Curated annotation (Swiss-Prot):
The keyword ATP-binding applies. It is a single-pass type I membrane protein. Belongs to the protein kinase superfamily. Ser/Thr protein kinase family. It comes from Arabidopsis thaliana. Residues 1-20 form the signal peptide. The active site is at 412 (proton acceptor). It comes from the Eukaryota. The lineage of its organism: Eukaryota, Viridiplantae, Streptophyta, Embryophyta, Tracheophyta. One of its GO terms (molecular function) is protein serine kinase activity. This is Probable LRR receptor-like serine/threonine-protein kinase RKF3. The gene is RKF3. Glycans are attached at residues 22, 124, 135, 165. GO terms for cellular component: plasma membrane.
């Protein structure tokens, strides 16, 4: 009898263990079926899966009160996701293509797993504001903008490190709001579009319906043609009558925007020129907080007392308003804790000031990184703050490259475009030079724009722009942050020297830590400082193929292992010889390895990152 009892106990333990190992996934993947599927390319599909998983988390949270599936179900959840993708992309491997790791699907922000844990971190006033602003249909622009703006108040309380890129701290507010602040739930059309950038798919048509569509289309085309002809005759007559009347140049008429509205997907607020004049005290010089080649930046206050920044562009013409409108619309749709939020815009023609083009952004309290490194501020930044700024810059740029749709290449990353909030969280700003990367292209030729010392060699020489052009600029800014030396300085002989060449000369001689500013407060461990220097040198390598991607940079900076990607030998200083650059532009792999006093090993990534057998320098 005792023997049988022992067998029963062993059998129970074994079956329980097996059940835990093969726990079914609690996420309901059928929820994603009504939503439009992506085009068959890696970047778009990965973004769809990322946002789709977040919508599933929200649906799961609404049903169970838990944000994430249990860790023991991670494998089955990935298998279920793979099965759902196989229906429209049969050869697409979710984890290997998108870089997802198995545990990430059950890991989130600051170990938060339940609704009560999340709400305990956020002030009741912020939760109440979100419940009020988000509890409506979010299909149109105004309620969506109001809802997402209220969610930004959650971010200061969700600043912990994220273990993966599936459900990070930046995404938790949207997951929570869709589940509980909005009574319609995450699967509602407006909620999914506003908070997860997912559109419902159009219903499929049968053969008979297609015929009806063709007939209807022809009828609409015929009617439209008649209307166009009628409108043309009306326009000609109206234009002729206007020539016989004196021009009306009143201020009210002049301040009308050339663009009356934006598209349905934008969350921008359109300000009148008079509103902005009032907010900036008629563009008073005392309100100027920044100057640049594209115009001045003014501080001001909105009617509700909110402090904002107004960037006023120079030398504008109404003819460029369409491109301007498209650019700000795309920028406004990109939301991340390390990107400066765009609140609104203004386009107007006035009788005295001429054509105006202005964007309205959040005002940050600690100025720019340039102010703290090279401005009048005397206090040195301590290492913990510099480390936070470096990580924030990297995460913001990585999101522009791989989280935004379409991906955005900034083109003008520099210290003055890295703004710092009250917690010294970095905000990547100034998208005036942003260039949108067309799907399927590895590079594009464009008019070179940027700032001396920060522009990548292949871009400066040939105008060929890729995400790795931004990586180069990031490396230069990171070196400035570590050394407190400007991008371009003069040596003892009065010759210009780039900070990248100066840093490389020290690293090559085994003096890596000499790059770090003397007397830095709260200086970190030598091995950590050395890792950051080597990452900066790698990013600012003159050869394109040698640089990592921003995703790889984030992983290296966040890693507790003191490893770094292999660094190839650099060619001649500042800008490599044209033959080397030519080869670099058309190449996607390189080799080389850097030894260091603390004994770094090569940190290799799959994909397009540099790796392989190396030559020690």
């Amino acid at each position: 009898m005792l023997f049988l009892r022992r067998i029963a106990v062993v059998f129970f333990v074994f079956t329980s263990f097996s059940a835990a190992q093969n726990s079914t996934c609690p996420l309901d993947f059928s929820v994603l079926e009504p939503f439009r599927r992506p085009k068959p390319d890696g970047a778009t599909t990965c973004q769809y899966l990322l946002q789709g998983l977040r919508l599933l988390y929200s649906h799961h949270l609404r049903q169970t009160g838990s944000f994430l599936p249990p860790p023991e179900s991670a494998a089955s959840c990935w298998a279920a996701l793979q099965s759902s993708v196989a229906g429209f992309l049969p050869r697409f491997d979710v984890r290997s293509t998108c870089g997802f790791q198995t545990p990430w699907i059950s890991q989130g922000c600051m170990d938060i797993t339940t609704r009560s844990q999340f709400e305990s971190l956020i002030p009741n006033s912020s939760l109440a504001t979100t419940a009020m602003r988000c509890n409506t249909s979010l299909e149109s622009n105004t309620p969506c903008a109001s809802c997402t703006q209220s969610l930004s108040a959650f971010q200061p309380y969700l600043s912990g490190p994220s273990l993966g890129n599936v459900s990070d701290c930046a995404s938790f507010p949207s997951i929570y709001a869709a589940a509980f602040a909005n009574s319609l739930g995450p699967t509602d059309k407006g909620t999914a579009k506003c908070l997860f950038q997912l559109d419902l798919a159009s219903p499929t048509s049968s053969g008979a319906n297609k015929v009806k569509v063709l007939v209807s289309s022809f009828s609409v085309l015929l009617v439209a043609s008649v209307l166009v002809i009628t409108a043309w005759f009306w326009y000609c007559r109206r234009k002729k009558s206007k020539l016989l009347k004196p021009r009306d140049t009143s201020l009210e008429a002049g301040t009308q925007s050339r663009l009356d509205s934006m598209s349905e997907s934008t969350t921008l607020v359109k300000f009148s020129f008079d509103e902005i004049k009032k907010a900036t005290n008629n563009f008073s010089r005392h309100n100027i907080i920044g100057r640049g080649g594209y115009g001045n930046v003014f501080k001001g206050a909105l009617p509700d007392g909110t402090q904002v920044a107004f960037k006023r562009f120079k030398n504008c013409s109404a003819g460029g308003d369409a491109n301007f409108a498209h650019e700000v619309e795309v920028i406004a749709s990109i939301r991340h804790v390390n990107l400066l939020a765009l609140r609104g815009y203004c386009t107007a023609t006035t009788p005295y000031e001429g054509h105006q083009r202005i964007i309205v952004c959040d005002l940050v309290s600690n100025g720019s990184l340039h102010d703290h490194l090279f401005g009048d501020l005397e206090a040195q930044l301590a290492w913990p703050l510099r480390q936070r700024i470096a990580l924030g810059m990297a995460r913001g740029l990585a999101y522009l490259h791989y989280g935004a749709q379409p991906s955005i290449i900034h083109r003008d990353i520099k210290a003055s475009n890295i703004l710092l909030d009250e917690r010294f969280e970095a905000k990547v700003a100034d998208f005036g030079l942003a260039k949108f990367n067309p799907e399927g292209m590895t590079h594009m030729s464009t008019r070179v724009a940027g700032t001396m010392g920060y522009v990548a060699p292949e871009y400066a020489l040939y105008g060929q722009l890729t995400e790795k052009s931004d990586v180069y600029s990031f490396g230069v800014v990171l070196l400035e942050l570590l050394s407190r030396r400007k991008a371009i300085v003069t040596d003892e002989e009065g010759q210009p020297v780039s900070v990248a060449d100066w840093a490389w000369s020290l690293v090559r001689e085994g003096q890596t830590l000499d790059v770090v500013e003397d007397g830095m407060p709260e200086k970190g461990p030598p091995e950590v400082l050395e890792k950051y220097v080597l990452i900066a040198v790698l990013c600012s390598h003159p050869q394109l193929h040698a640089r990592p991607t921003m995703d790889q940079v984030v992983k290296m900076l966040e890693s507790n292992e003191f490893t770094v990607i292999a660094i190839p030998q650099r060619p001649i200083p500042l800008v490599a010889c044209r033959e080397e650059i030519d080869r670099s532009v058309s190449s996607s792999s390189g080799s080389g390895k850097l030894t260091s006093p603390t004994g770094y090993q090569a940190f290799s990534f799959g994909g397009d990152g540099p790796s392989g057998n190396t030559n020690t320098t």
